[in-house]
């Protein structure tokens, strides 16, 4: 029995519950004790992002983030707790000091540190995080690397930053033959000036100003429809690669292959030597095209390909894609006979206009999409810079940027059609960068500077070639070219510039470069530039790219491809996912890194030493897996036929390694646990 004492709220203070019996009852229920009071929340600190070391006396590559937790859950109402960090005594190197701001105030329960570092190199460092009245937390152990020797470079790789898929179609080449070097490419293209007037029904084509403006059968293929394109197309697709075919949109294609010189020597040559190339047939397609009529139908070409290769336009890894002609901004000179110049002594046709290009693109792209909506359409296939900005001074340019106009018009065309017509913005890029030289080119008026695309290996040309890839992206680099001097008045930053136009005018459009070349085909400088370009294409998110060869011996350019696609001679390849990779000196050395989406235990790093002296590289890696070994493949000027050579493995400790890069070399490292 409980004795109840009624005194000034004593019952409540004692936490007792009293039950009284009701009227007529025999006694009452025994009083029950009240529930225990709710304990105050237990607050703890939790290291949400572990610190990742870098080089001594530098800020951490990854700064720590600490959560203030209440009963195991981040307290998002906490905007006041001050978290203090200190080195755990006895860890790391004796005498080391923690540098930077050692306090951080929580915001929504999260305290983020921004500039911490440690003064001395060492291993096993730990940090302790404390706050008044809150259970503290300790970080995982981490390492701090010694700085590289003076004048050397450091690379930092972080698989948690800038992570995105690499398009498989950036490793391409025009007219690729899978049976010879370079192996294991991913895209081929049937393009070039010859395709502008290519008759897919008969394989006749016109050389334009490349060779006397004559009609001939230079492309081969006999009388089989698409015979000139078929062997390369089928070889590429059998090798697992995609294929870009060209749909002519100039309005005429060759009607014969007489090979008798300039077609302008034939009276009424347009009607006699050419057939009208029409976007739409307007009637049922034929399994075999009619070669006796006056027309060649381009939608029937797409139907022919679709029937010959079912599902190819929608294939994931080896699709068919369609380029809308080739360099239409140069038709007036490359195919002057089809642009109104009937004089065999001149090459001065009429330049296509902005409006004409939009209309032709709309007509032919919509015709192709009506046959197969899955077909990827690439356009406008500009030849280069002046074509991109003014369409080679088209009569209706009116100081408007051509690509801005083109993209905006294609967006409107999509609205009208109810679906996309152009999927990929396609341009060509032959750099105009020049280096100091004694110019051997008799057709070049500049006798003291050489364009890097020629096969010159004088020191100034080589130096310019090695730096030229930076104009694809680097806002701090200005090349020596007429573009940088008179058009951009500074850095070109080609890829960010083009992506910015897409974002502003037609979001969702992809980007390709279906012809490019940096010269030095059989020189180590060509390999360095090619490898650099492939790394940039992957990092910057390009959709597709195909090299156009300018020389007969391309061994070192092929070597540049090998370092990404066949470094071990067994199709060893760069990963499918790009991650952050930074260099301390972009002029001397660049670095690109990848992981595999399906395999965290493999990381591939490509290191490019552009310096004429050997460079010792310190490589620090942030990754979820601890690596222990790096397989090494190397390309130098001494590499036979520009082929990579395997080197002894290098040990990796605490995800850090030192590697001595030979002068002017490309090194591919394959890291594994």
What is the predicted role of each segment?
Residues 18-19:
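C-terminal motif of bacterial Sec signal peptides marking the signal peptidase cleavage site
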Residues 27-148:
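Core sequence-specific DNA-binding domains of diverse transcription factors
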Residues 156-296, 300, 323, 328-352:
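N-terminal substrate-binding region of glycoside hydrolase catalytic domains
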Residues 165, 170-172, 242-244, 319-323, ...:
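Structural preference for beta-strand elements that scaffold enzyme active sites
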Residues 296-309, 328, 335-525, 530:
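Noncatalytic carbohydrate-binding groove/subsite architecture in carbohydrate-active enzymes
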Residues 523, 534-604, 641:
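Glycan-recognition and catalytic regions of carbohydrate-active enzymes
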Residues 586-626, 667:
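Carbohydrate-binding surface patches
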Residues 650-673:
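C-terminal beta-strand-rich structural cap/linker in extracellular carbohydrate-active enzymes
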């Amino acid at each position: 029995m409980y004795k109840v004492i009624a005194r000034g709220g004593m019952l409540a203070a004692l936490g007792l519950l009293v039950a009284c019996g009701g009227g007529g009852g025999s006694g009452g229920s025994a009083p029950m004790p009240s529930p225990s009071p709710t304990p105050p929340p237990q607050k703890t600190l939790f290291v949400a992002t572990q610190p990742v070391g870098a080089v001594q006396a530098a800020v951490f590559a990854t700064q720590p983030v600490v959560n203030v937790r209440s009963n195991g859950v981040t307290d998002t109402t906490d905007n006041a707790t001050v978290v203090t960090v200190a080195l755990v005594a006895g860890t790391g190197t004796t005498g080391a000091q923690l540098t930077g701001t050692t306090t951080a105030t929580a915001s929504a329960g999260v305290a983020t540190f921004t500039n911490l570092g440690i003064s001395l190199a060492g291993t096993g460092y730990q940090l302790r995080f404390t706050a008044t009245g809150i259970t503290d937390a300790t970080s995982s152990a981490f390492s701090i690397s010694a700085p590289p020797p003076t004048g050397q470079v450091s690379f930092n790789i972080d698989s948690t930053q800038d992570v995105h898929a690499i398009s498989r179609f950036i490793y391409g080449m025009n007219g690729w033959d899978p049976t010879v070097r370079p192996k294991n490419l991913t895209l081929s293209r049937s393009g070039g000036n010859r395709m502008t007037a290519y008759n897919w029904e008969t394989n006749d084509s016109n050389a334009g100003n490349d060779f006397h403006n004559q009609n001939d059968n230079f492309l081969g293929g006999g009388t089989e429809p698409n015979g000139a394109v078929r062997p390369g197309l089928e070889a590429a697709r059998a090798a697992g690669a995609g294929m870009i075919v060209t749909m002519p949109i100039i309005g005429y294609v060759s009607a014969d292959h007489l090979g008798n010189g300039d077609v302008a020597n034939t009276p009424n040559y347009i009607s006699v030597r050419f057939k009208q190339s029409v976007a739409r047939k307007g009637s049922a397609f034929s399994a075999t095209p009619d070669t006796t009529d006056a027309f060649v139908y381009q939608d029937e070409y797409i139907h022919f390909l679709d029937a010959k290769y079912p599902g190819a336009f929608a294939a994931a890894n080896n699709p068919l894609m369609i380029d809308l002609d080739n360099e239409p901004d140069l038709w007036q000179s490359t195919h002057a006979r089809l642009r109104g110049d009937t004089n065999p002594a001149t090459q001065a046709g009429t330049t296509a206009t902005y409006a004409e290009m939009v209309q032709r693109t709309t007509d032919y792209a919509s015709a192709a999409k009506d046959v197969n909506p899955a077909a990827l359409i690439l356009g406008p296939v500009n030849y280069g810079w002046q074509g991109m900005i003014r369409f080679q001074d088209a009569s209706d340019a009116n100081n408007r940027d051509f690509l801005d106009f083109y993209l905006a018009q294609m967006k409107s065309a999509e609205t009208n059609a109810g679906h996309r017509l152009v999927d990929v913005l396609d341009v060509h890029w032959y750099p105009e960068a020049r280096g100091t030289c004694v110019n051997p080119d008799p057709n070049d008026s500049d006798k003291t500077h050489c364009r890097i695309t020629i096969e010159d290996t004088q020191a100034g040309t080589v130096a310019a070639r090695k730096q030229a890839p930076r104009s694809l992206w680097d806002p701090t680099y200005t090349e020596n070219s007429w573009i940088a001097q008179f058009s951009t008045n500074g850095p070109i930053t080609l890829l960010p510039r083009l992506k910015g136009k897409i974002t502003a005018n037609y979001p969702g459009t992809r980007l390709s470069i279906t012809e490019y070349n940096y010269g030095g085909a059989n020189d180590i400088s060509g390999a360095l530039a090619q490898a650099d370009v492939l790394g940039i294409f992957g990092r910057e998110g390009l959709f597709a790219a195909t090299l156009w060869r300018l020389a007969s011996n391309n061994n070192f350019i092929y070597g540049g491809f090998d370092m990404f696609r066949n470094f071990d001679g067994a199709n060893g390849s760069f990963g499918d996912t790009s991650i952050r990779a930074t260099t301390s000196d972009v002029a001397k050395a660049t670095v690109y890194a990848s992981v595999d989406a399906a395999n965290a235990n493999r990381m591939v790093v490509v290191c490019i030493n552009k310096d004429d002296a050997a460079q010792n590289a310190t490589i620090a890696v942030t990754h979820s897996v601890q690596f222990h070994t790096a397989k090494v493949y190397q390309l130098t000027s001494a590499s036979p036929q520009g082929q990579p050579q395997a080197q002894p493995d290098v040990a990796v400790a605490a995800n850090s390694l030192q590697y001595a890069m030979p002068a002017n070399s490309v090194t591919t490292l394959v890291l594994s646990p």
